């Protein structure tokens, strides 16, 4: 690793020539400048499309074989990983263990700045050991500037356990190189406020994590068309969404959809299979289990298919 005390060469630390007069702009000019600069995030995602697709495929394979997905980061990068992981259970009805976020400083760092904790390579390495990482798992190291010791300690620990590794950063390989399975470079350029990587770097990182986690869940069969058929029904909003999905896909009335959802044990996926195949709940559960929860695959192998 390069000398961590000298980071001025990194793209994320450089001065943005478009914002040299940032403190003299009107509020509207500030908004317009942010809007203009944020367009770089879309370009960065487009430039990394092949690597992102590779990450989706590799992670899908790992999770389908019993592995887990771990995001590791410090500061903003760590919080974004925790955020994405926390959204998977309600969106895709996954267990909290399937996708996890590991942040330097633990839960306290989610609420209070803990920048000093990112400098410990050993803490990152120990975090991997404490989570019992195996060769079935995928570790995503997230560091906007590329050099965070905590993240590199975690990645090294992952490699020692033969886990798959993904690196997400906002600096080019010429400025910082690393050996991982998938290397994703989201080059959004210098920040409007020099060095404040919670801005464009944070935005583009969230976009990449959105693509990774959602892409994996789509590939695992937790989506039918563009419908959230594995939604965990935990409140009235999500129950309404579940009922609307059933209504839209089956043309049942609201009351009929409610009855079907109740019979399925509040599983949209199972409710749809029961309706389309005339299977009872127990048999539907068995069929879905046989096809690893993939509704479309199950429907191709039962009678009364809608295909």
From Swiss-Prot:
Signal peptide: none annotated. Specifically catalyzes the cleavage of the D-lactyl ether substituent of MurNAc 6-phosphate, producing GlcNAc 6-phosphate and D-lactate. InterPro entries: Etherase_MurQ, Glucokinase_regulatory_CS, MURQ/GCKR, SIS_dom, SIS_dom_sf. NCBIfam families: N-acetylmuramic acid 6-phosphate etherase, PRK05441.1, PRK12570.1. This is N-acetylmuramic acid 6-phosphate etherase. The gene is murQ. It comes from Trichodesmium erythraeum (strain IMS101). Homodimer. Gene3D superfamilies: 1.10.8.1080, Glucose-6-phosphate isomerase like protein, domain 1 (3.40.50.10490). It comes from the Bacteria. One of its GO terms (molecular function) is carbohydrate derivative binding. Pathway: Amino-sugar metabolism; N-acetylmuramate degradation. Its EC number is 4.2.1.126. Keywords: Carbohydrate metabolism, Lyase. Belongs to the GCKR-like family. MurNAc-6-P etherase subfamily. A lyase-type mechanism (elimination/hydration) is suggested for the cleavage of the lactyl ether bond of MurNAc 6-phosphate, with the formation of an alpha,beta-unsaturated aldehyde intermediate with (E)-stereochemistry, followed by the syn addition of water to give product. The active site is at 87 (proton donor), 118. Residues 59-222 form the SIS domain. CDD domains: SIS_Etherase. One of its GO terms (biological process) is peptidoglycan turnover.
């Amino acid at each position: 690793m390069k000398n961590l005390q000298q980071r001025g060469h990194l793209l994320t630390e450089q001065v943005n020539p478009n914002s040299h007069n940032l403190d003299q702009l009107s509020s509207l000019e500030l908004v317009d400048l942010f809007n203009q600069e944020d367009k770089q995030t879309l370009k960065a995602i487009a430039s990394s499309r092949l690597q992102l697709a590779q990450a989706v495929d590799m992670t899908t394979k790992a999770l389908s074989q019993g592995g887990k997905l771990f995001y590791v980061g410090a500061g903003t990068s760590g919080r974004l990983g925790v955020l994405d992981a926390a959204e998977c259970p309600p969106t895709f009805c996954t267990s909290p263990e399937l996708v996890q976020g590991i942040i330097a400083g633990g839960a306290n760092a989610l609420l209070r700045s803990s920048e000093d904790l990112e400098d410990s390579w050993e803490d990152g390495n120990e975090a991997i050991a404490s989570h019992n990482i195996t060769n079935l798992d995928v570790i995503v190291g997230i560091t906007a500037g590329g050099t965070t010791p905590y993240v590199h300690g975690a990645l090294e620990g992952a490699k020692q356990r033969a886990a798959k590794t993904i690196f997400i950063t906002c600096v080019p390989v010429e400025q910082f190189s690393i050996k991982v399975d998938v290397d994703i470079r989201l080059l959004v350029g210098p920040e409007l406020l020099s060095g404040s990587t919670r801005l464009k770097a944070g935005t583009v990182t969230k976009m990449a994590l959105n693509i990774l986690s959602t892409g994996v869940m789509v590939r695992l069969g937790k989506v039918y068309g563009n419908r959230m058929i594995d939604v965990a029904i935990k409140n009235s909003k999500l129950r309404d969404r579940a009922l609307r999905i059933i209504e839209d896909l089956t043309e049942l009335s609201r009351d009929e959809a409610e009855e079907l959802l109740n019979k399925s044990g509040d599983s949209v996926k199972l409710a749809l299979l029961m309706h389309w195949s005339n299977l009872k709940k127990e048999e539907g559960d068995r069929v879905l289990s046989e096809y690893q929860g993939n509704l479309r695959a199950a429907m191709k192998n039962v009678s009364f298919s809608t295909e």
